[in-house]
């Protein structure tokens, strides 16, 4: 069986199909895939906390960095992940796709304390994971997700439902490009 590559793709929750509250009206960036597992971050679900709250909780001086803490997914919700442009790195940074990288260490918060930050970023708690067959079933059998190649703007220029709507529009545009 051929392995679908979802790495670097966006999953856009289809309206009226995705009923899981973690993923309804969500935009998920799949940044890593093995032959068994896909790992991604929900991009458009801010929590009630902000970056300053997290810095204070972790004993790091509040840098004044503005921004929500986003819910990256229901797995490892105590873990912090920084999705950011690849113009910056920390001790545990991995290159992703589309000019993005992912960092996940305490040093990233300390760097932010000293205004050493990437051009664009989102701080996430948790991540989203699927077994590859599970994700394939959600996409092809249950038709719960639109799968689309992202553009750079969608990662950082929208928020909440606006980001989901931008994802729907991007998927529609890409489909129209294929048809005409």
Where are the regions a protein language model picked out?
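A short aromatic-anchored loop/beta-hairpin motif
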Residues: 1-180
């Amino acid at each position: 069986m051929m392995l679908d590559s979802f790495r670097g793709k966006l999953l856009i929750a289809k309206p009226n199909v995705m009923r899981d509250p973690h993923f309804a009206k969500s935009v998920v960036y799949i940044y890593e895939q093995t032959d068994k597992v896909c790992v991604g971050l929900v991009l458009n679900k801010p929590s009630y906390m902000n970056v300053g709250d997290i810095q204070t909780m972790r004993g790091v001086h509040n840098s004044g960095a503005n921004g929500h803490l986003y819910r990256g997914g229901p797995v490892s919700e105590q873990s912090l992940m920084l999705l950011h442009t690849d113009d910056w790195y920390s001790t545990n940074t991995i290159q992703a796709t589309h000019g993005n990288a992912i960092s996940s260490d305490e040093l990233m918060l300390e760097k932010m304390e000293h205004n050493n930050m990437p051009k664009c970023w989102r701080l996430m708690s948790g991540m989203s994971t699927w077994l590859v067959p599970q994700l394939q079933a959600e996409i092809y059998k249950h038709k719960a997700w639109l799968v689309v190649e992202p553009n750079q703007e969608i990662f950082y220029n929208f928020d909440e439902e606006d980001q989901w709507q931008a994802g729907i529009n991007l998927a529609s545009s890409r489909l129209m490009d294929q048809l005409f």
